[in-house]
């Protein structure tokens, strides 16, 4: 039921990858404004040169769920009785981590007598991005470790106009960070970004794979790995000149981001939009925002992006999207509160939008 101020309040649980996030949000019944009450996150960080395995990540989420939930509740300043629903990430994501957090969400729902709402991870990113930036009806570029999609809203669905044909752009960057044995703290993609800022002297030729509004990153990763092996062996680059890890990171970023800008611009022309909203962990990258901004400015448009509190996986986006669905009457029965590693963005009926 609404709190003393008439607000609906939701607690959201996210754990589709290596970040465990729990957040609490309130919706103002008059203005419709979303108010972030708390947004707590804990990240599983693996050693340099390695990725995060599902079993280890799931173990981390199980170990930290209670303390993160307690902290989120304490920071929010609300009581358990004021919370209307418990929202959790249904998918897509890694099976083990998803399941660990879903079990935690079910436990809270049963302990507190609250209703459950399963949320699509991508829709959570989109709705949080719209709420924070004020973007009205943008073309959405969703870029993360597990997803790369160009999306636009139409007829109560977030339609996918283009996507990766193999691996996600974030996965490409993360895997190359392993090749160079770059630290995973705070995130491999962030550390590649910082290293790329030291490059720029050399732009190495890497495969550029765009097919209409779709793109591919496996070929460019393979070529970047080959060049890294040459560099470690002391061999010169294709032009006979030596190159550094910074040059490799710079070249990789410039190429993959140019691909993303191209397919986003094509989608903007197709749907007639002059707004771009960048969501997902890779959306924090300042160079991507800069390149996208230059393209949008040439079209008389604008780019919207959030900071790391909201573009990196978090619980508050799940709470927000879940509460939007809850307010339309959507519920997830306990016996249907499963998880799925495959959950397409356009499968969700977006009842809360016209």
UniProtKB/Swiss-Prot annotation:
GO terms for cellular component: chromatin; cytoplasm; EKC/KEOPS complex; nucleus. GO terms for molecular function: chromatin DNA binding; metal ion binding; N(6)-L-threonylcarbamoyladenine synthase activity; nucleotidase activity. GO terms for biological process: positive regulation of transcription by RNA polymerase II; telomere maintenance via recombination; tRNA threonylcarbamoyladenosine modification. This is tRNA N6-adenosine threonylcarbamoyltransferase. It comes from the Eukaryota. Its main location: cytoplasm. Component of the EKC/KEOPS complex composed of at least bud32, cgi121, gon7, kae1 and pcc1; the whole complex dimerizes. A divalent metal cation binds at residues 121, 125, 142, 313. Keywords: Activator, Acyltransferase, Cytoplasm, Metal-binding, Nucleus, Transcription, Transcription regulation, Transferase, tRNA processing. It comes from Neurospora crassa (strain ATCC 24698 / 74-OR23-1A / CBS 708.71 / DSM 1257 / FGSC 987). Its cofactor is a divalent metal cation. It catalyses: L-threonylcarbamoyladenylate + adenosine(37) in tRNA = N(6)-L-threonylcarbamoyladenosine(37) in tRNA + AMP + H(+). Component of the EKC/KEOPS complex that is required for the formation of a threonylcarbamoyl group on adenosine at position 37 (t(6)A37) in tRNAs that read codons beginning with adenine. The complex is probably involved in the transfer of the threonylcarbamoyl moiety of threonylcarbamoyl-AMP (TC-AMP) to the N6 group of A37. Kae1 likely plays a direct catalytic role in this reaction, but requires other protein(s) of the complex to fulfill this activity. The EKC/KEOPS complex also promotes both telomere uncapping and telomere elongation. Gene3D superfamilies: 3.30.420.40. It is found in: Cytoplasm; Nucleus. Belongs to the KAE1 / TsaD family. Binds 1 divalent metal cation per subunit. Its EC number is 2.3.1.234. It is an enzyme of class 2 (transferase). The lineage of its organism: Eukaryota, Fungi, Dikarya, Ascomycota, Pezizomycotina. Substrate binds at residues 142-146, 174, 189, 193, 285.
